[in-house]
Amino acid sequence: MAKAIPRRSSRRNGRIGSRKSARRIPKGVIHVQASFNNTIVTVTDVRGRVVSWSSAGTSGFKGTRRGTPFAAETAASNAIRTVVDRGMLRAEVMIKGPGLGRDAALRAILQSGILLTFVRDVTPMPHNGCRPPKKRRV
């Protein structure tokens, strides 16, 4: 019969404290994806590494309330609160999608005190690409 391999504790391999909070981010990029059902706000550094994120669903809104402007405003303020504590002063904003939370999220970003260098709409638009799905008959 095979000899049992003794299990070693994985504590020695794991990190004891989180090292993410030590990094200071003076400039970043705020990505807002506003769909009709939800709004997702992701804050990255200039290289594209995610620093903080939040969505209307993680902010406590469920169902159809996730698509509301108030939910988008709450999600944006939750995502930005952590990066303001880390020292973010300037940011670029990339807004994607047709949802109701576009303007509300931008309003929450402006109220946070971060200086915006530019706001860009990066909603993907087809140059007559794929055929769209057929119209709904309700």
Curated annotation (Swiss-Prot):
<dbReference type="InterPro" id="IPR036967">
    <property type="entry name" value="Ribosomal_uS11_sf"/>
</dbReference>
<dbReference type="GO" id="GO:0009507">
    <property type="term" value="C:chloroplast"/>
</dbReference>
<dbReference type="Pfam" id="PF00411">
    <property type="entry name" value="Ribosomal_S11"/>
</dbReference>
<dbReference type="InterPro" id="IPR019981">
    <property type="entry name" value="Ribosomal_uS11_bac-type"/>
</dbReference>
<keyword id="KW-0694">RNA-binding</keyword>
<dbReference type="GO" id="GO:0019843">
    <property type="term" value="F:rRNA binding"/>
</dbReference>
<keyword id="KW-0934">Plastid</keyword>
<dbReference type="InterPro" id="IPR001971">
    <property type="entry name" value="Ribosomal_uS11"/>
</dbReference>
<feature type="region of interest" description="Disordered">
    <location>
        <begin position="1"/>
        <end position="23"/>
    </location>
</feature>
<keyword id="KW-0687">Ribonucleoprotein</keyword>
<keyword id="KW-0150">Chloroplast</keyword>
<dbReference type="GO" id="GO:1990904">
    <property type="term" value="C:ribonucleoprotein complex"/>
</dbReference>
<protein>
    <recommendedName>
        <fullName>Small ribosomal subunit protein uS11c</fullName>
    </recommendedName>
</protein>
<keyword id="KW-0699">rRNA-binding</keyword>
<dbReference type="GO" id="GO:0005840">
    <property type="term" value="C:ribosome"/>
</dbReference>
<dbReference type="GO" id="GO:0003735">
    <property type="term" value="F:structural constituent of ribosome"/>
</dbReference>
<comment type="subunit">
    <text>Part of the 30S ribosomal subunit.</text>
</comment>
<dbReference type="InterPro" id="IPR018102">
    <property type="entry name" value="Ribosomal_uS11_CS"/>
</dbReference>
<comment type="similarity">
    <text>Belongs to the universal ribosomal protein uS11 family.</text>
</comment>
<dbReference type="GO" id="GO:0006412">
    <property type="term" value="P:translation"/>
</dbReference>
<keyword id="KW-0689">Ribosomal protein</keyword>
